[in-house]
């Protein structure tokens, strides 16, 4: 029982160290990042934690994963680094380039070189690998949230506003940034119309030259009598479509 508590305490300590690791930087789309995946700080600056492999290298990694019976391809890299630990230890430590600490003040406490992962014991590295899987799962959750927010913002920014009867002196509101592309993509199935009800509500129809400038001649069937007529005014469709 005491051993289990010690393991939990050690795992919590490693998790805290990982979240507070100054070499891990999270980039969010909300703050201008192209993607939201975490990046790692290296002697060459921030680098994406995801590494692109050549075709042949990817095949070898997947084959080795099957032969080792590992659950994830990334564990193959961990295994290779573990096997090569003695050779890696013979390499000179990574040195910070001149001016590195000025550009990365949060890393000033690391000394003259980056701390190595191999300085941890095997049990600690295994616990760290467990936390890494949790981190990856958390990344997937944030991916889903970012995708949902991006989709919602896209819908809001691409809304089309058409003539709306708000009072006896109604005005026309247009947001035609993507209208022509929408018409092209949906092959004329867009449910938009300038209703003929303006005759009954003292509304002035848009001028023919205005409509011609908004809709090119590639949609000749859409133009008639100076107004857009995708369906007749007797249709049950509403006048305001969003």
Swiss-Prot record:
Protein name (record): Transcription factor TCP17
Coiled-coil regions listed: none
GO cellular component: nucleus
Signal peptide (from-to): none
Function: Plays a pivotal role in the control of morphogenesis of shoot organs by negatively regulating the expression of boundary-specific genes such as CUC genes, probably through the induction of miRNA (e.g. miR164). Participates in ovule development.
Subunit structure, interactors included: Interacts with SPL.
Organism (species): Arabidopsis thaliana
Record keywords, A-Z: Developmental protein, DNA-binding, Nucleus, Transcription, Transcription regulation
Boundaries of every TCP domain copy: 33-91
Subcellular location: Nucleus
Pfam families given in the database record: TCP (PF03634)
Keyword hit for Transcription regulation: yes
UniProt key word Lipid metabolism: no
Expression across tissues: Expressed in cotyledons, particularly in the vascular region, in leaves, roots, stems, buds, flowers and siliques.
Gene: TCP17
Primary localization class, coarse: nucleus
GO MF annotation, one: DNA-binding transcription factor activity
Any one GO biological process: leaf senescence
């Amino acid at each position: 029982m005491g051993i289990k508590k010690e393991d939990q305490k050690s795992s919590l300590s490693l998790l805290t160290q990982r979240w507070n690791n100054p070499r891990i930087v999270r980039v969010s789309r909300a703050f201008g990042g192209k993607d939201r995946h975490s990046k790692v700080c290296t002697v060459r600056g921030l680098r994406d934690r995801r590494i692109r492999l050549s075709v042949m290298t990817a095949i070898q990694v997947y084959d080795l994963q099957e032969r080792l019976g590992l659950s994830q391809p990334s564990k193959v890299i961990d295994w290779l680094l573990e096997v090569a630990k003695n050779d890696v230890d013979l390499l000179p430590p990574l040195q910070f380039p001149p001016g590195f600490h000025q550009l990365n003040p949060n890393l000033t406490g690391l000394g003259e070189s980056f701390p190595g992962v191999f300085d941890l014991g095997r049990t600690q590295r295994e616990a760290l690998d467990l936390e890494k899987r949790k981190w990856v799962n958390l990344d997937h959750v944030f991916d889903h949230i970012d995708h949902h927010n991006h989709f919602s913002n896209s819908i809001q920014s691409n809304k089309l506003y058409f003539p709306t009867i708000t009072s006896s002196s109604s005005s026309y509101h247009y947001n035609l940034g993507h209208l022509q592309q929408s018409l092209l993509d949906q092959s004329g199935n867009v449910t938009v119309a300038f209703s003929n009800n303006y005759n009954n509500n003292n509304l002035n129809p848009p001028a023919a030259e205005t409509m011609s400038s908004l809709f090119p001649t590639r949609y000749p069937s859409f133009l008639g009598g100076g107004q857009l007529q995708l369906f007749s005014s007797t249709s049950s469709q509403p006048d305001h479509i969003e």
